[in-house]
C-alpha cells in the first residue's frame, strides 16, 4: 500500500470514528426527534395510530434505531407523557413565581395554566394522553405522582376540598372545550375562572 493510500485510509477511519462518536454523544437529541415525531402523529391521527413503525417513518430512522431508545410503544408513550408533564411544570412554576400570594398558589397556577391552554398543540397532546389513562396504568401513576408531588409542596388550601374543586373545575372547562366544542362564551369562561380564582384565596374553615 502506498503512503498516499495509507493517509487516505487513515483519513476515512478518522471520519468514521468522528461520525460514530458524534452519534454516541447525541442520544438526547435523537430521543427528542423521536418524541417530536410521536407528538406529530398523536396530534394528526390520534394516540391509537401511534405505532413504532409510524414513529420511525416520521422521524426518518430505522425501527431498530427507534427500539434502541424506546424498546416498546408503552415506553414511548410514557416518555411522551413525562415530557408534557415537564412542560407543565415549567409553565406552572413561572406562574407561581409571579404570584406574590403563597396561599393556594399551586391550585391558582394550575387553574390559570389549564385555562390558557385553549386549542394549542400542547393542549391537544395532553388531552389525548389524558384520555388514554384508563387503559394505560403507567400514565395514571405518572399523573398521580405528579399531582401528589405538588400537593406535598402545597399548603392547606391546595390539600383541601376547595383546592380540589378549583383544579377539577379547571380540568372540566378544558376537557369540555376539547370534547364538546365551545359551549360557553369567552365571557362566561372568564367569569368562571375569575370566581375560581377568588375561591383560591378563601380560608379553610
Regions found by a protein language model. Name each.
Residues 41-75:
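Helix-turn-helix
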Residues 1-29, 205:
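N-terminal intrinsically disordered/low-complexity leader segments
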Residues 36, 100-118, 164, 190, ...:
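Amphipathic alpha-helical segments that line or abut small-molecule/effector binding pockets
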Residues 110-114, 126-131, 166, 170-173:
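Short alpha-helical scaffolding segments that buttress acidic/His motifs in well-ordered protein cores
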Residues 137-144, 148-205:
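Hydrophobic/aromatic-rich alpha-helical bundle segments in the mid-to-C-terminal region
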Residues 7-11, 29-54:
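Short, amphipathic alpha-helix enriched in basic
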Residues 79, 86-125:
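Hydrophobic alpha-helical connector segments
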